[in-house]
Structure formats: structure tokens, C-alpha cells
Amino acid sequence: MGVTDIIKDFDKLKGQKLVYGSQGKTSLDAVPILAFDMLGLPVNVVYGMKGRKAGRAAILRGETTIDYQTTASYLKHVKPLVEKGEMVAVMTWGAPSGGEVSRDPNFPDLPAFPEVYEAVTGNKFKGTEAKSWTALFYAGFATQKYVMLPKSAKKDVVKAWQNAAAAIVNDPAAMKVLNKKLGKYDQVTGSKALKSALKKATSIDSKSEKFLQSWKDTK
């Protein structure tokens, strides 16, 4: 494609035949699909992928031309290809920071989606579309992999699990392994922090919800 910088080469990217292999519009893929629309990229979304592994295989076979992978998958499977010059990483979805979506700390040299949006559209990352995308982002990426217990679990059992999670987060040896495999992100532990994160991941304003319902029906 000849695209190495999504902002500088954006017009070149828009002129390409872009095909994305998706798991479904109500899956995590709602995040990239809406992002493509917001950027005005002419992406042909092909449904039927069984997972991002299948999506990765499709782009490696040349069946698709644009893809995304989670940090863990990228570090293990895609980064070596980037280093060989066989793939190009152009942006991340970002990471929560101070109430905003900023650059992912694991990829500080890559712009986050909100940054790309503002640069190529000339608009601030605000309004219903931006709020809708951010709600999807928090639900799909920023807060995930919760450890859940039955509501009937006794307090001492809940406390034991909370203490175990905190012990892992505070164990440098354990975190070294996790950070290497999954990427270095802040881990959420403790009842208060978890409730706050869960609320953000499961809440959406009515205007954004209405927009997403309508948008989904067009895909």
C-alpha cells in the first residue's frame, strides 16, 4: 500500500481497496468498524471470521487488506512481521488516561484513534459519534477480563479473591510475565475501583445508544 504514517499518508490509504474480516458488528469489531466510518475510509467489511486469529490469517493470505489485533496477539504474532517489513502498524485504539483516550503506553510512537480522527478530519473528537465510539471502546477494550463470583458468595470468599488479585498485581515477578505477554496496562483491583470501572464499561447515554442502534442497522 505504501502507507507508513496514517496521518501523512491518509489520502493514499483512502484510495486503496480496503477489506476487513469481521467477527460481527455486535462483537468487539464494532470498535474498528465505527472507527473506519468516522475516518471516512472505504472499508468493505466481510463477516464470518471466527475470531481475530482468523482475521490475522486472512490478511496474511492476502484475502483482506486491513486488520487489528489485541496487544497480546500483536506482540506474539504481528510484531515479528512488522520488524521484517511484512506488515505496518499505523495506529492503536488508545488507552484510558485521565478520563481521556490517549496513546497506548505499549506503543507510544503510534497515534491513538482519537488523535488520528482529529488530524485527518480537522474536527475535535467530540459529539455523539465520538461518545458512542468511546462507550464501545471502554466496554470492549479498556475494561475487560473481569473475575466474577456468584452473588451468593460469602464475604470471606470475596475477600480472598480480592486479596489474591492484589497480591498478583503487587508481585513484580508475576507482573513481569503478564506485562510481557499481555502488554503493560494498569490492573484494576479492589471493590471501589472495580465498581467504577464496571459502571463506565456498562453505561451509555441515551443519544449514543440510539445512534449505535441506527448505525448498526446500516452495517
Identify what each model region corresponds to:
Residues P172, T189-K219:
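Extracellular/periplasmic bilobal clamshell ligand-binding domains
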Residues L39, E63, T71, V82, ...:
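Sec/Tat-exported extracytoplasmic proteins
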Residues G94-D104, F113, A166, A174-L198:
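Mature extracytoplasmic/periplasmic domains
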Residues M1-R61, G122-K131, G140-V177:
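Hinge/capping helix and adjacent helix->loop/strand transition within the periplasmic-binding protein
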Residues Q16-E118:
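Ligand-binding pocket segment of bilobal, Venus flytrap-like solute-binding proteins
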Residues I6, H77-V169, K210, W215-K219:
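C-terminal lobe and pocket-closing loops
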